[in-house]
Regions:
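Alpha/beta-hydrolase active-site loop signature
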Residues: 1, 23-27, 69, 94, ...
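Conserved HGGG/HGGXW glycine-rich cap/lid loop of the alpha/beta-hydrolase fold
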Residues: 1-32, 36
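Conserved acidic catalytic loop of the alpha/beta-hydrolase fold
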Residues: 42-60
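Conserved hydrolase catalytic core segment
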Residues: 59-102
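A catalytic-pocket lid/entrance helix-loop region that shapes and gates access to the active site
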Residues: 86-128
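Alpha/beta-hydrolase
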Residues: 110, 114-199
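Conserved loop-alpha-helix segment in the C-terminal half of the alpha/beta-hydrolase fold
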Residues: 191-234
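Catalytic active-site module of serine/aspartate enzymes centered on a nucleophile-bearing elbow/loop
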Residues: 225-265
C-alpha cells in the first residue's frame, strides 16, 4: 500500500492525518501463505482491529478504500458504521458481477481485435505466467485504464507497491484474469445494501477507470448521504493521473463533513 505515499503531499498540508496499512499477506505485513485465510470477513475484522489499536472512533475516523479496499470499506461500513465519521469508496463498484460485465462489454471492445484474441487464448489456457500476457496488457490495458501517465513516468511508490504484490492472495480473491473477478469475490454484490449506509459517503470514479464511472455515480445516490467525485482525466489510479480533481474533491468532502455540512449535491 505504499502507493498511498502521494497522499502526504496533499492531506498533510491541510492538517489531515492519515494512516495506511498493509493487510495480512501483503506488503510489509506477515505472509502466512495459507490461502484459507483470504476471505472477506477476516479482512473486515482486521480493519476493526487496526481501528481499535489506533483509538479511532466516530469523531475522527474516515475510512478510505481504493479498488479492493473499496470492497473492504463497504463491508466494514455495513457492519461497523457506528465507528465511522465518513466513508470514501475510491474506484470500486458495489458489484463484482457488474464489474465483469463492464470489462467484457465496454473495456474489451477497446482492444485491437488481434491483441484481444491473443489475450483470450492465454486466459483460456490459464497460461498466466506467459510473459506475453503482461507484455500485451501493460501497454493496451494498464497504460489506458490503470494509470494513464506514460509508462516510463509511472510514479516510483506505485511501481514499488505493484512489485510487492502477493500474487497468491490476488489470485485467490480477484482471480488471475484482469477482465472481471474470478476468485473468492466472483459473486460479491452489496448494491442492494447500500441504502443501509447512513454515514457521509464519497464515491470516486475516473472517466477511464477499469470500473464503470456511471455505476460509481449511481452508488452515491443509493447511500443515505452520498456525494460523487468524477476525475475526468483519471483512470483506476486517479490519485496519480488526475490529482487536480482527486485531492481537492477528497479534501473538500472531509472538510464539509467536519463542518457538519450536508454532503449531498
Amino acid at each position: 500500500h505504499e502507493y498511498f505515499e502521494c497522499f502526504e503531499s496533499f492531506l498533510l498540508p491541510q492538517d489531515i492525518e492519515f494512516i495506511y496499512y498493509d493487510q495480512l499477506g501483503c506488503g510489509l505485513s506477515d505472509n502466512p501463505k495459507d490461502t484459507s485465510m483470504w476471505d472477506l470477513p477476516r479482512f473486515v475484522e482486521e480493519v476493526e482491529q487496526v481501528r481499535k489499536a489506533l483509538g479511532l472512533n466516530k469523531d475522527n475516523f474516515y475510512l478510505l478504500g481504493h479498488s479492493w479496499g473499496g470492497i473492504l470499506a463497504m463491508q466494514y461500513a455495513l457492519k461497523y458504521q457506528d465507528n465511522l465519521k465518513g466513508l470514501i469508496i475510491s474506484n470500486m463498484m458495489s458489484s463484482c458481477p457488474l464489474y465483469g460485465k463492464y470489462a467484457q462489454d465496454v473495456l474489451a471492445p477497446q482492444f485491437d481485435p488481434k491483441i484481444l484474441d491473443t489475450i483470450r487464448q492465454i486466459e483460456a489456457k490459464k497460461d498466466f505466467d506467459n510473459p506475453k500476457y503482461m507484455e500485451l496488457l501493460t501497454p493496451h490495458f494498464y497504460a489506458k485504464h490503470i494509470c494513464r501517465l506514460p509508462l516510463e513516468q509511472w510514479p516510483e511508490p506505485m511501481v514499488r507497491s505493484f512489485n510487492k504484490m502477493n500474487h497468491s492472495l490476488y489470485v485467490t480473491m480477484q482471480g488471475p484474469s484482469e477482465f472481471g473477478i474470478g476468485g473468492n469475490l466472483v459473486n460479491w454484490d452489496v448494491s442492494k445494501e447500500l441504502p443501509k449506509i447512513k454515514v457521509p459517503t464519497l464515491t470516486i470514479g475516473g472517466t477511464h477507470d477499469t470500473m464503470d464511472p456511471e455505476h460509481m455515480k449511481w452508488m452515491s445516490t443509493q447511500v443515505q448521504h452520498g456525494r460523487y467525485l468524477l476525475c475526468p482525466n483519471g483512470s483506476h489510479m486517479s490519485m496519480y493521473d488526475d490529482q487536480a480533481h482527486y485531492f481537492p474533491g477528497l479534501i473538500e468532502f472531509i472538510k464539509d463533513v467536519d463542518a457538519g455540512k450536508e454532503v449531498k449535491r
